[in-house]
Amino acid sequence: MSKFFINRPIFAIVIAIMITLIGLLSMVNLPVARYPQISPPSVRVSTMYTGATPQVLNDTVASVIESQIVGVQDLDYMTSDSASTGTYSLSLQFNQGSDPDMDTVNTQNRVQAALAQLPSEVQQVGVTTTKSSGDMAYIFSLNSPNGTFDSTFLKNYGTNYLMDAIKGVKGVGSVQEFGSDYAMRIWLDPSKMQKLGITMSDVTSAIKSQNVQAAAGTVGKNPTNGEQAFQYPIKIDGRLVTEQQFGNIVIKNSNGTVLHLKDIARIDVGAKGYDFVAKSSYRDPNAPSGEILFVEHRPSAGFAISLQNDANALETISNVQKILQEQSKSFPQDLEYHEVVDNTKFVRASINEVEHTFFEALLLVLIVVYVFLQSWRSTLIPMIAVPVSLLGTFGAFVLLDFSINTLTLFAMVLAIGLVVDDAIVVVEAVEYELKYNGLSPKEAAIAAMKNVQGPVVGIAFVLAAVFIPVAFMGGMTGILYKQFALTIAVSVAISAVVALILTPSLCALMLKPHVQNEREDFVHRQLNKFNRGLERFSDWYGKVLARLSHRLSLTVITLLVFAAGTGIVFHFLPTSFVPAEDSGYFLIAVNEPPGATSARTVETLDKIKDFLEQTPGIKDNVEQVFTVSGFDLLGGSQKSSAGVSFAVLKDWDQRKSSNQSVNAMVGAVFGFGAKSVPEASVVALNPPSIPGLGNTGGFTMYIINKAGDSAEVMAERAQAFMAEARTNPAIQTVYTTFNTSTPSLQFEINRDKAAQDGVQLTDIFTALQGFYGSIQVNDYTSYGKNYKVVVQAEDQFRQNADNLNMLAVRNSKGQMVSIANYITKDKTSTPSSITRFDNAMAVKIGGSAAQGYASGDAIQALKDAAAKTLPAGYTYDWGDQSREE
């Protein structure tokens, strides 16, 4: 075959050009990512039961939905969280390789089957099922530097004017919004209601009956008698829009006196919920030279963008940034946006490092080849063949559905040393024929290929036999190794083809016949010294081999010793799924004592922000701090006593020393938290090493209660387990957000007395919900979108439980009676949230390995602690990255 192409070098060159062009075109259009798409498909189910405790959510919502979902096709495991805010969130992880769209459909079908068994309040709100991705590739915030706009306006401005364009970008999967939708807030005055004889049910019924979407029809619509000349569609104000219209809702009409909603309530457009408080600060670019100052923005709203599985991360985020830049030109005055997290910066930096290594490897190959072949013509041939082989590999990426990522590029770097061997073997064989047999370049190429054609093919098959079996490994590890292994295998295969087609043709065209006693220049005289040294080494090495050939037993024993040593060292090496890396930012999770208010959480987050922005050695490395109060990063739920900070650092090229690394910053925050806010739990964490596997790095474990124990007993088991785990030096931190000591009030209703007085329990429940919680009555339309109408008591009436006597209901005789007559109060405690794993109550455990220990060591330490402390009826399982490891 080689002789055919040697005689037709143009044909060989054309084939090489085609391979190169296919590779170049493929490379331009291939998706670019940090890692291959390895996170398994995930589906999220969520709903809200306003005013419900975690235990009520667990009993009436979580158990109902999860009992239906158990056994859905391709489900790996599921976890859920029932929070004290009334929110329920279920995350389902499916087996790798399953169809995400079918997973979503199958889950939705199971949820629909459970819908009829859910409380009516939950049915009214609805249960949403969405395809989920945990990879927050890009986070930006909207800010009002001078405080012109509040956080509710900022969030809804982003939703109404930015989200449609951003969600339409190719590659964008979903957007998580840190903020609340608009709502028509009806702030009731219970004292006025009591005086005027108005109940909570009266208010909600009036709103439902008078805020309705009405379609009145058309005057003159067919069929008619034919005498009608025009049709007149009837316009009617059914659904209300403004605060004034809601204020004019008639609550009561008696004795010619009309009582309106505005007489007993304050009405305004506010937020549907006030659980999130977002703030953003960033380094002031206008600060005097040598000073580090931060511009603080209050308020703020955040938006986190997740990508689709097959998205080109660089292209997608670049298009999102273009939209933000374009839309910002029409922002109202005193509104601006800032990037918080851009994970593509890490992707770019990683790929740039690999590219530098790639070209450094090519340069080293060039030098080594020239030193040994000592001819620029001979050196040029492998340097032409290598890029053809590597670029051709990109063409195979399209067929194999690979992306350009750090693993495939790393494989290409290693492949340089393999693919250049084929070209060197051919060139050396041709040089031998030229030098020792005096053949012409064309004859030498033909003669050489007769000798090396078999070895070139054999090398390709041997390397393929080594790497291709790795591609058949299962699970997430198999996906990682698959792209790495097949990249090398494909590049070696293309290299063998190039060595049989292009390289001998180039040898016939470019090499010159060998000339005896050719005049040597300075470079060749120096190379001759290298040759003499190499010959002396070769002679010595030959003598050593000759001696060893007579001592075969010594050779075998030496080989066995090295093999045994390798096995021993491998056994003691720490294990890890993937190493933790400096992603350019880190997360700080804050958990206040159970029951703490949002204001207290915001205060702690402000202290941490001030520490980052004012402490020498730390503020020099911090670019931006974005905080969100009301979100429990570790538990994955909404909670007034929890919050999270995103601390964004300067670029890597500006942080060279070890004390400027993420790990150094994390350690400093741990120390500050323990010293300055000991009453709160402050945990600083790296983001997950593999996007999509959890919210943070480190390990994730679930202690599963299959014994049916109460939450209090379960908490005791978890604390005993963590106490044992902390004694192991492999554990740096181990924590859980589960507790049962959240202060609460137990309301006991005297049902017998209520029945005797003709008071309906549902009226009492409605009054309590509307007073201390809130009731989402129905909807109104604004800015072309539908928002909720929410009824709730004014804040001064909700600050303590002694105002119960202000709440009145109507008995069967039409008389107003205070619900305080039927309720007794008692202080107690309750879980702040309840976690479930595979339809069983569980405790989520998180943490990280100590310095000098790998994640595998930490996992083994947790296994040992579980074996010592968990009683019968308790088991454990793993989540996120730990499950794959």
Residue positions per predicted region:
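Transmembrane alpha-helices and their membrane-interface boundaries in multi-pass membrane transporters
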Residues: 2, 416-430, 453-472, 479-527, ...
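Surface-exposed amphipathic alpha-helical segments in non-transmembrane regions
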Residues: 13, 18-20, 25, 29, ...
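Signature of alpha-helical transmembrane segments and their immediate interfacial
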Residues: 1-32, 452, 524-578, 676
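Membrane-helix entry/capping segments
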Residues: 306-311, 317-364, 396, 404, ...
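Hydrophobic transmembrane alpha-helices and their membrane-interface caps
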Residues: 22-29, 34, 44, 336, ...
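Small-residue-enriched core segments of transmembrane alpha-helices in multipass membrane transport
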Residues: 107, 367, 379-400, 415, ...
